[in-house]
């Protein structure tokens, strides 16, 4: 396990991003985080912009997916690496499901700082997702303020798949 007094040992790190986005990590047992921590990873997480718990203005990401939430996750990663030099920044991973999976896709398409990623139950392309989900087509209008008939360009600009060639 992690021993803060041992400054010589390094650990791989995992940024884990919750679903939602209107959800939140709380100080409770979260199976995936515990499994990775038990395997020797330094697991860290945040409740980025778009999360519940700080009011509607903070939680409303409408039309901004993959922008300020991404910046927030990268700022938290920077701060964690600064506070815990035992984390090997060359052995970073990112993971998440649903919205966390979308953000995992977004992260790996927009930065090369993570060596591994596990995207679960995620959106990678807002256009193809629009009519192939149990959530319904209206989710796109609510979340990114676009649909394939009125503004497919905006949908594509918010799609992690667009940035997959990084």
Descriptions of predicted regions:
Residues 8-20:
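Short beta-strand element of the alpha/beta-hydrolase
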Residues 23-24, 126:
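Short glycine-rich, flexible loops that bind phosphorylated cofactors or substrates
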Residues 24-27, 53:
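Short N-terminal helix/helix-N-cap motif within the alpha/beta-hydrolase-1
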Residues 12-13, 42, 116:
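Short, Asp-centered acidic motifs that coordinate Mg2+ and/or phosphate
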Residues 45-166:
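Active-site-proximal cap/loop segments of hydrolase catalytic domains
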Residues 1-9, 159-164:
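Short beta-strand-to-loop junctions in surface cap/lid or active-site-entrance loops
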Residues 27-46:
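Short amphipathic alpha-helix adjacent to the substrate-entry channel of hydrolases
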